[in-house]
Regions:
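Charge-rich, low-complexity N-terminal segments
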Residues: 21-170
C-alpha cells in the first residue's frame, strides 16, 4: 500500500507487493552459520601478541543469494549443504593457517610435519580468511545449484567479540 501511495504522489513506477517491477532486480537471501570451529593462525606482520601462534573458536556465517527460488521455495536447502560442512571439517577443524608470506612457515612445517594440520592462504587476518572462504565456497555453491544461487557474503567471527566480512563489489 505504501509503495503504491508513494508512487502515485511522486510519479514513480511501482513494483507492487513484490517490490521491483523487474523480476531480475529481485534477490532472495538466507544464511547458514557453522559455529565452534577451532583453528589457529599467527599474524607475522603484527607488532603485538597476534604475531604469536594462537587459536580461536571461529564461526562462519555464509549468506546466500538467488533471483529465483528452487522448486521447494528455497534459496538453498540447508540440509543439502553437507559439502560445505565437509570442507570445513577437512580443512579448518584443528588446523593451523599460515600466510603464504610467513617467513617461518616452511621451516616450521619441515621441522614439525606432524605438529600442524596446515592450510596456507594469502592472508590469515580475519578479513583475509573471510575472502579465502568466499573464493572457495562461492564456486562450490554455484556448481551445486547449477548457477542458480551464489555466496553473497562471508562473515567470519573470531570468537565472540570480533568479526570481519567479505563480499565482492556489485
Amino acid at each position: 500500500f505504501l509503495a503504491v501511495w508513494l508512487a502515485s504522489r511522486h510519479n514513480v513506477p511501482c513494483g507492487g507487493p513484490m517490490g521491483s517491477p523487474n523480476p531480475s532486480l529481485r534477490m532472495f537471501t538466507c544464511s547458514k552459520t557453522y559455529r565452534d570451529i577451532p583453528f589457529a593462525h599467527r599474524q607475522h606482520r603484527h607488532e603485538g601478541h597476534c604475531s604469536f601462534l594462537h587459536g580461536h573458536n571461529w564461526a562462519i556465517e555464509i549468506e546466500f543469494g538467488c533471483e529465483r527460488l528452487d522448486e521447494r521455495g528455497f534459496v538453498v536447502d540447508f540440509g543439502g549443504l553437507g559439502f560445505l560442512k565437509l570442507w570445513i571439517a577437512e580443512n579448518l577443524d584443528h588446523a593451523c593457517l599460515f600466510a603464504q608470506s610467513d617467513p617461518v612457515r616452511e621451516q616450521l612445517l619441515k621441522d614439525y610435519p606432524k605438529l600442524f594440520r596446515p592450510l596456507v592462504i594469502e592472508s590469515v587476518s580475519t578479513e583475509g580468511i573471510a575472502q579465502h572462504l568466499f573464493e572457495t565456497f562461492d564456486p562450490m555453491v554455484r556448481q551445486e545449484t547449477a548457477g542458480r544461487a551464489w555466496v553473497r557474503q562471508i562473515i567470519l567471527h573470531e570468537d565472540t567479540k570480533n568479526k570481519a566480512s567479505y563480499q565482492p563489489k556489485a
